[in-house]
Amino acid sequence: ARFDLHEVQAADGYAYNLAIERFNMDFSHQIGSFVSTDAQGDWWGGAGGGTVAHAAIASFLGDTAEAMMQFSRVLPAHVPRIALVDFNNDSVRDTRRAMETMFMKYRELCDLNDEAEAAKYILYGVRLDTSGSLRDVSVEPLGDPALDLGVNPRLVFNVRQGLDSAWESWN
């Protein structure tokens, strides 16, 4: 939304929502539409929310996992939890820490049969927002800024691998 003109956010959000609905219909899924601004949901009744800002993580001294825990504790369960994981330029580590911390709280609450409170600690996704002038520590430099910097396919792949294998290190 940051680079989208405010005049077209409603139309862009509507097109996105139609694409999600079409995907769900074609592949028998029930994926929800998530947008970051209310304007993007204006034409179809969606509401922005779910992700945290860099400033929120800074308020917790750069501790992404703690910022997500507090976000989860305070907001109602229907607000999707989407972790911004690039604050420290170590997206894989921060993804895994946020995911593990939230899952352990979720599990603790489920063990106490408090499913309503546990639902607040479900991580819906992660958001990469690495500046085009920075290289995440998980991306080995190739010497070409177009391949090394910002959000790039190698960073996305590294984070996906980190998500898929995170549980292997949990107790």
Model regions and ranges:
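Buried, small/hydrophobic-residue-enriched core segments of structured protein domains
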Residues: 1-169
